[in-house]
Amino acid sequence: MSLIHINILMAFTMSLVGLLMYRSHLMSALLCLEGMVLSLFILMTLTILNSHFTLANMVPIILLVFAACEAAIGLALLVMVSNTYGTDYVQNLNLLQC
């Protein structure tokens, strides 16, 4: 395994640990999720380029589309929670149920 792959896996692991440690605030959780998706995107792109598998060239773009949707939904949730309660605690998400 090359040094680039190890660095990308370390970035994914650090984002996962950050998500587990700083899960009380929604903004921190969203940033950690974005870091995880970005490292997965880079790892997937490098793997596809190194394997010369031309049929899978669209997979990283599909992952970016899902990441953009996740970011938009996460920011909408963050705005709704912060406007309603004045804080961005994840525990306030349970109070948004009907």
UniProtKB/Swiss-Prot annotation:
**What coarse category fits the chief subcellular location reported for this protein?**
mitochondrion
Which protein, by its recorded name, is this?
NADH-ubiquinone oxidoreductase chain 4L
Q: How does it sit in the membrane?
A: Multi-pass membrane protein
State the organism of origin.
Phocoena phocoena (Harbor porpoise)
Instruction: Recall the GO molecular function terms of this protein's record.
Output: NADH dehydrogenase (ubiquinone) activity
Keyword Secreted found:
no
Q: Which stretches are annotated as coiled coil?
A: none
Q: Cite the source lineage.
A: Eukaryota, Metazoa, Chordata, Craniata, Vertebrata
Show the Pfam families listed in the entry.
Answer: Oxidored_q2 (PF00420)
The UniProt catalytic activity note for this protein reads:
a ubiquinone + NADH + 5 H(+)(in) = a ubiquinol + NAD(+) + 4 H(+)(out)
